């Protein structure tokens, strides 16, 4: 962390001496986050998001003996004034499933998710809940296709997830089961719980079998309409990384296209805000750090401009700095976070559509088996935690 940031941080603690120690308040049961033009809002005021990803919350909460890790994570997030966590509300097949077969659910895993939602509420953390993975981890679309094959469907591609009627039926049934679940702790149905900020249709969707984008567009149209028919309380986003279609492929890393389209997908009725992910070190490994940083700035700006055109808020839903990056240091991670946070703050301060960011990812202490290079253990990362707190405090002053 550079000296100017330290001085700003000290000044904030002097001016707002109670802000650091004051716990975040739990929110009431009546008020849902909504959008107001290009802004998130809550209780009549603009809401700016500073938060984190923790995909593992339900997985860890499955075992009552390890639920303290979930509690500690929310405690730490609240300490640094974070207000949103993005997590998986799925685990399809495998050794610790939420859904072990189509329509067959693991009550212990569901109770783990109940606990996550209940604890998030206690610490004033809203949740973004993703409903399926594009990737194989925790089952993903591959598992849905395999279930259909086991029932006699002649499928040859994981992308059949987006078109096969049986598979789409499996997905819809899962959406209904999750949204109508009544929390065993709070006694509130998920669809009626304002702790949840938003549902996410699918994490990082890609459809390489149809690069025109038509297949995925039709799927979003169908599933957004279906989900909203069950739950009109909550916001909905797709889970996009931000890739454009063929007509704007020059903005994508290496001009690749992935069968999704940031513009047309987000124009679907029922999609309430836009998202992007940012991994220039993975997507553009041949570039220098300076060139990657320049690309990242351009990536954010073009999506700010297009979200303004779409008249929807933008959330930077994943970004991070990997410890596996050549030459990595904590100071470089802090500097990267500062750059992203600065862009978010400047956009928000000027009335723009960028409503916040979620870094990837928070881990609790003693969770080294979950390390993926991007982990931030807040208790063990004082300088990064201060950068996060500074962002939380200055965004809160805009509300």
From Swiss-Prot:
<keyword id="KW-0378">Hydrolase</keyword>
<feature type="binding site">
    <location>
        <position position="279"/>
    </location>
    <ligand>
        <name>substrate</name>
    </ligand>
</feature>
<feature type="binding site">
    <location>
        <position position="88"/>
    </location>
    <ligand>
        <name>substrate</name>
    </ligand>
</feature>
<comment type="similarity">
    <text>Belongs to the glycosyl hydrolase 5 (cellulase A) family.</text>
</comment>
<dbReference type="InterPro" id="IPR017853">
    <property type="entry name" value="Glycoside_hydrolase_SF"/>
</dbReference>
<keyword id="KW-0964">Secreted</keyword>
<feature type="active site" description="Proton donor">
    <location>
        <position position="204"/>
    </location>
</feature>
<feature type="active site" description="Nucleophile">
    <location>
        <position position="318"/>
    </location>
</feature>
<dbReference type="InterPro" id="IPR045053">
    <property type="entry name" value="MAN-like"/>
</dbReference>
<feature type="binding site">
    <location>
        <position position="360"/>
    </location>
    <ligand>
        <name>substrate</name>
    </ligand>
</feature>
<keyword id="KW-0326">Glycosidase</keyword>
<protein>
    <recommendedName>
        <fullName>Mannan endo-1,4-beta-mannosidase 4</fullName>
        <ecNumber>3.2.1.78</ecNumber>
    </recommendedName>
</protein>
<keyword id="KW-0732">Signal</keyword>
<feature type="binding site">
    <location>
        <position position="203"/>
    </location>
    <ligand>
        <name>substrate</name>
    </ligand>
</feature>
<feature type="disulfide bond">
    <location>
        <begin position="347"/>
        <end position="354"/>
    </location>
</feature>
<dbReference type="GO" id="GO:0016985">
    <property type="term" value="F:mannan endo-1,4-beta-mannosidase activity"/>
</dbReference>
<dbReference type="GO" id="GO:0005576">
    <property type="term" value="C:extracellular region"/>
</dbReference>
<comment type="function">
    <text>Possesses endo-beta-mannanase and mannan transglycosylase activities. May be involved in cell wall degradation during fruit ripening.</text>
</comment>
<keyword id="KW-1015">Disulfide bond</keyword>
<feature type="signal peptide">
    <location>
        <begin position="1"/>
        <end position="26"/>
    </location>
</feature>
